[in-house]
Structure formats: C-alpha cells, structure tokens
Amino acid sequence: MTEQVVNVIGAGLAGSEAAWQIAKRGVKVRLYEMRPVKQTPAHHTDKFAELVCSNSLRANGLTNAVGVIKEEMRILDSVILKAADQCSVPAGGALAVDRHEFAGYVTEAVKNHPLVEVIHEEVTEIPEGITVIATGPLTSKALAEKIQGLTGLDYLYFYDAAAPIIEKDSIDMDKVYLKSRYDKGEAAYLNCPMTKEEFDRFRQALIEAEVVPLKEFEKEIYFEGCMPIEVMASRGEKTMLFGPMKPVGLEDPKTGKRPYAVVQLRQDDAAGTLYNIVGFQTHLKWGPQKEVLQLIPGLENVEIVRYGVMHRNTFINSPKVLEKTYQLREQKNIFFAGQMTGVEGYVESAGSGLIAGINAARLALGQEPIIFPFETALGSMARYITEAQSKNFQPMNVNFGIFPELPPGRRSKPERAEMHATRAISTIHNFVNSQTI
C-alpha cells in the first residue's frame, strides 16, 4: 500500500466510483462532498450517488450500447453496478433501481471502506497532489472559477445547448446534397432542401410540439445567447430563415435553384458515421422531437443517437484539454470524471469515474495510466470526448455510432449491435487479463 493519498471531489456517481476503484487498489482516498453542509438546487439528501432525475439506468441487454458499458463495468467490479443490481426494481428490459436503497448502498460501501476518508465541506481550492474532480453539472461557483483557471476561460461551459446527432446510415442520400455555403472550402455539409410548403408544415409542427418544462435553476440559460429552435419558430415565419435554415448560397446542384429553406447536417465524428443538425438546439420532448425531425426531407427514417437538449450543466471542452486517461493534458496529476467531462448519463458518468479512478490509483502507485481499447464502450466514450469537434463539443451518451466501424458487409441493425457487443465484451476480458488493472 502506498502512503500517497488521492483526493476525489464530489460523491456523485462518478466520484463514488472513482473513490471505490482507487481504494480497492490499496490507495488512500480523501473524498470531499459538500452536502449536507451546502446543498445544490437539485439534490435532496446527503447520500452519495443520489439519482436526481430518473431512477432508470436504461437498457440492460447487450443489444444496446448502454447495456454493453454496464457489462464492462460489472467485469471491472463497479460499485455503482453492484448497487444497481442489488437494488433493482422491475422495469422490463431496463435496469431501474429503488433510488433510496441505491444511494444508501453506495454510501455505505464507499464510506465503510477502510481506505476512504470522507470530508463534508465545500471545496473552493483544488488540493495539492493527485486529484479527481467529479463535481457534476451543478458545480459550485467558487470551484468552477478554479477549474477555469486550470482549463482556460474559454474551455468551461455552464449549460448544454445540444442539437440532435443522427446516424449517417439513416439519411436518405437521394434527397440531400453535399455543399458548403457559397462553395467556400470543401463541401462539408449535407443539405436538406425544403419547399415553402414543407417549411410551413415543419414550422407549425415545431410550434405545436411538447417541450420539456424548465427547472427553476435552469431558467437563465436562454440569456447565454443560444435560442431553442422551437422558440425561433414561434417568433415569426422569417426567424429561422435568417438563422439556421438560411438558404442563401446553398443552391441545389440538381436544379441549380435556391431552396426556400435548408437544414444543414455537419459531420460530428472522425469516422463520419454521425451528423449533427446545425443550430437545432431544442427543449422538445424526445417523442415529439423525432416526429418533427422526420418532417425534414431526407430524414424521414432518421435514427437519433443523441436528442437535442438544453439544460444547466458544467462541463469542460474535453477535446481541447483532456487525455483519454481522463487526465488534464497540462497537469497530469489532475483527473476529471462524470458529466464534467462531457459524458452524458448516469452510467456513462460512473464509467468515466471508473477509468479516472483506476488511472489515479495507478499514478499514485508509480504505474503508467492506461487507455481502454476503443472497441469497448468505456474506451469509445473516452475516445469520443477527447477527439470530437472541439468547436462544437457537446455532451454525449454512449451509443454504437461512436464505436469503431465493423468489418465491411451488409447487416441489419440487430446484427450490427450484436457484433459490437460481442467484440466489446471479448476485448474488455482480454484487456483485463493482459493488464494489471
């Protein structure tokens, strides 16, 4: 056992998982949690890993990427997955939990580990030494200022304004065309042209679609200069035409004419399998959101891998500042974990905490931090958040679209999912067996 102590700031899902992974490797942990001394607007208890929104950890089967990441975490002795499996409630094919039992299980497991010291106080200065920052979307203002000092002022954000991300394979390429505005540079956008009738129908559907109600602590986000597409639609017929749906300079090469309106799709990942819908940040509920997007020519059969969202968040521009080990590039003793890194979702947050914890422990023990294979769900998340387009970086759930491509061949969607899952689980087993993790 080393005498070095690793600091973990925040006892949410990511921080609790990181602390557990560090301690089980024989390294002392100093775990800071400001609740109940100082509460956040979203939490209601002083327990670790409190689930503040849904009690579902989403799909449990291996036909879904989130099911795969959960299985990988079980293989790596995740305390979050232990708690979830122990405290599960009936939910069909999903893994849902009794949130009070779940938080209680995690709290007791982490607190009772002999190498974990829990300190209930607000952290306003980043401690010396090896530190994992896992303070979540509601990071306190004082600490956020210190994080800005570490990452640079331009690389810390305070809200999500994410447009939907879709699978390229679900786009009808016969209805779209590749072109950049005024043909500047290489043709970098897929363009979905609309007639006036199509635009009017689309705009009306946007106005009538059901939105997610804002929480009290989220109501300031529109003043940051980023407006939801449905708000633009409601402000008048021309608002979107002078904004994200502006057709100027985007003549359709098939007709030589300018469409009435254009929806632009921009490549989102290095592999070119995912595209985001430019300027379409939205507060629409997911069901209505898909129905509205299917009115866009070329997207009638769209597969959405991340729905558009707008909510209060605190996250860093990971492609600019983070390594795939979850270390800060410029200060290798600092790790980030959880939603702060740009992973989205309970399970993904815990998964990032698992990797950050393993690597913080390795650093404390004088070992090299490790990068998880990209064929795994854990590795693909780490790769996505560090290789995504930094200019438009927004948080992302795990999905098969961010995994490395499969060998060539025509396959159904279930067949592709099965191949991704089989490869991921085989890879994580081989990785664990070949490393001292």
From Swiss-Prot:
Q: What's any GO biological process attached to this entry?
A: tRNA methylation
EC main group: transferase
Q: Does the keyword Cell cycle apply?
A: no
The answer to keyword Phosphoprotein applying to this record is: no
Q: Name one GO cellular component term.
A: cytosol
Keywords per UniProt: Cytoplasm, FAD, Flavoprotein, Methyltransferase, NAD, NADP, Transferase, tRNA processing
InterPro entries tied to this protein: FAD/NAD-bd_sf, MnmG-rel, MnmG-rel_CS, MnmG_N, TrmFO
NCBIfam families, per database record: gid_trmFO (TIGR00137), PRK05335.1 (NF003739)
Q: Which PANTHER family match?
A: GLUCOSE INHIBITED DIVISION PROTEIN A (PTHR11806), METHYLENETETRAHYDROFOLATE--TRNA-(URACIL-5-)-METHYLTRANSFERASE TRMFO (PTHR11806:SF2)
Purpose of the protein: Catalyzes the folate-dependent formation of 5-methyl-uridine at position 54 (M-5-U54) in all tRNAs.
* The protein's name: Methylenetetrahydrofolate--tRNA-(uracil-5-)-methyltransferase TrmFO
- Give the lineage: Bacteria, Bacillati, Bacillota, Bacilli, Bacillales
